[in-house]
Design a protein with these regions (language model features):
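Metal-dependent phosphoester/phosphodiester hydrolase catalytic core
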Residues: 1-221
Length: 221
């Protein structure tokens, strides 16, 4: 969230005061404020849900919702908070984000309480994640508990001809390869997120690349 007294406009558009985040953090890039508690996430949801056009749309049409990155943390993944700076353990933040999403987004997903009405308390600690499985998932218990506090990926069937599959691209995501030291060997920063096909195949396969014998080093160009 940007505050109009700090950033009056962005892309020639007026910044409105949708709310002030209590006990939040500030991005290492620009003057973005982001929530770290359930009260902070509630401020964000209340702010954007005050939009009369969105209210009218919600009243008229059904929505099928799944979260993206900003429902938790801009550059975050699993229960790791990252917003223009170094990654930090954020298991309590992930649970808070999941709780607020559950409270404000219409979706039939099961919370820790086992109910569709209340989220339920879930105690976790912000602990560094030091061990990972072969797919890049941190196996630290608080990380797994935070991630699984709310599972939003699901499938819906409409009639005989439509199966709608909603995927979660962030809760189980591995490390961003563009953050790695020496990444310039396989990555051109002037083309953000663009890898050569050979590098992309190797990155997707991970430890299983080349029959389980990936090269010690990849080069680009």
């Amino acid at each position: 969230v940007e505050y109009p007294d700090e950033v009056p406009t962005r892309y020639d558009r007026t910044i409105y005061d949708v709310g002030r985040i209590p006990d939040g953090g500030q991005s290492g890039v620009g003057k973005f404020h982001y929530p770290l508690t359930v009260d902070g996430y509630r401020v964000v949801y209340k702010g954007y849900l005050a939009d009369p056009d969105l209210q009218d749309a919600r009243a008229r049409w059904p929505f099928v919702a799944i979260w993206d990155n900003h429902e938790f943390s801009w550059q975050g993944r699993q229960s790791i908070v990252q917003a223009g700076g170094a990654p930090q353990p954020g298991q309590t933040v992930k649970v808070a984000a999941n709780q607020a999403w559950f409270e404000y987004i219409p979706a039939r997903v099961k919370a820790p309480s086992g109910s569709l009405d209340t989220f339920g308390a879930l105690a976790v600690k912000n602990v560094p994640i030091e061990k990972w499985d072969d797919g890049g998932l941190g196996i630290e218990p608080n990380n797994l508990k935070a991630i699984n506090s709310l599972i939003a990926y699901r499938s819906l069937r409409y009639g005989r001809h439509l199966d709608l599959i909603l995927t979660d691209q962030h809760s189980f995501c591995g490390a961003d390869p563009t953050d790695a030291e020496g990444v310039a060997k396989i990555y051109d920063p002037s083309f953000n997120g663009m890898f050569s096909e050979r590098a992309m195949i190797a990155l997707d396969a991970g430890r299983t690349f080349n029959g389980g014998k990936p090269p010690a080093e990849l080069t680009f160009g």
